[in-house]
Amino acid sequence: MFDDMVNLFNLGAFSDEEKELLRTDFTYKKQMSRLLKEARQAAKRDTCYFCGKSVTSFCNSHSVPRFCLENIATNGDVLTLNTVVDNPLMDTENGVNKAGTFHLICNDCDSKIFSDYENPDNYSNQPTPKMIAQMALKNSLKSISKRLFEIEFFNISAKKTDAARMFSDAKNAANEMDLKEYVDSYKKAKKALEKNSSVDYYVCYYEKLNYVVPIAFQCSLALSVDFNGNIINNIYNPSPEYRIQNIHISILPLKSETVIVMFIEDGDKRYRQFYKQFNKLTLDDKLAALTLIMFMYSEDMYFSKSIENEVRESKALCEAGKTGQDIISFTPFFDPLEILRESHSLDKRHEIPNLLSEKYKLS
């Protein structure tokens, strides 16, 4: 069971035989369900993360604005990355009410602090600095929630076997570092929102498409390489002084249009070459790059059933969806950064269906 707990966080790690066993082994499913429930309960707070007030229930917050999910849903359902990953421990389909949700703040705070960017009427023009700060705040909260859960999950699994303890200790050492950085980003976003600052974030790309794309996405990502293969984030740097830098990407399908926003924290200079290279691409090439980046770096994308066949039948998309950053070189003869460059090469955008292009539009 320990290997399966590890594979829950290692997309695409199961063999076909293991997948079939996990789909039919109801005893195992019950054990895993209990473990996940225990981890969620252990990670649950008794105060709102934003205002600090005691609460008995939390808001069902969405990482992607609910109205965007509704715009691409079929009978209230959207597909997840598991459509290509095929991990038997993950859902392939989610109802809009459960897609990308987290429970960290109270209903009152959720309704107030995200009110600007979660209003579809506010996208007639480029998002305001306040809306950008709200996006950054939401991304930070989602990341914090995810890491709090994973820390408890691995704390619990560490009690199972010695092997589980060794793996869990190593995983949680990284999780704790991630959590600290997410909390720092959260504090920055909260401060920017409270003072209505226009200088804390730099919007490096904004586009409004005159059609509805079949994908809804909002996340902060730590890109590894740029278009020329230069390292942006060295995930192997052991120094506690080295800070991973994230880029925020939002792909928001409206009723008849789509808004795309990409921004960074002001001062995050490692992305400078990346966004300069990106902005020189044609529109189609930009959309292909964004499609690849979503599949390669995040699990938190949701898409319409209208493109299910295209997604399932693309071997390149499936491989991109299974790409992880836990890449380790087990021999001194191989440079892990070279492996990272190859596995995360943005040249692969030419091999995948460009799901953000007009060809796949919903309307």
Task: Name each model feature, range by range.
Residues 180-363:
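Charge-dense, low-complexity intrinsically disordered regions
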Residues 5, 17-18, 22, 26-36, ...:
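Generic structural signal of hydrophobic/aromatic residues within well-ordered alpha-helices
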Residues 65, 106, 125-132, 307-312, ...:
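General structural signal for secondary-structure boundaries
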Residues 1, 24, 129, 133-136, ...:
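Non-membrane alpha-helical secondary structure
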Residues 48-51, 137-140, 144, 217-219, ...:
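Generic structural hydrophobic/aromatic packing signal, biased to beta-strands
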Residues 77-179:
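Internal, well-ordered alpha/beta segment that forms a basic, Gly-enriched binding/recognition surface
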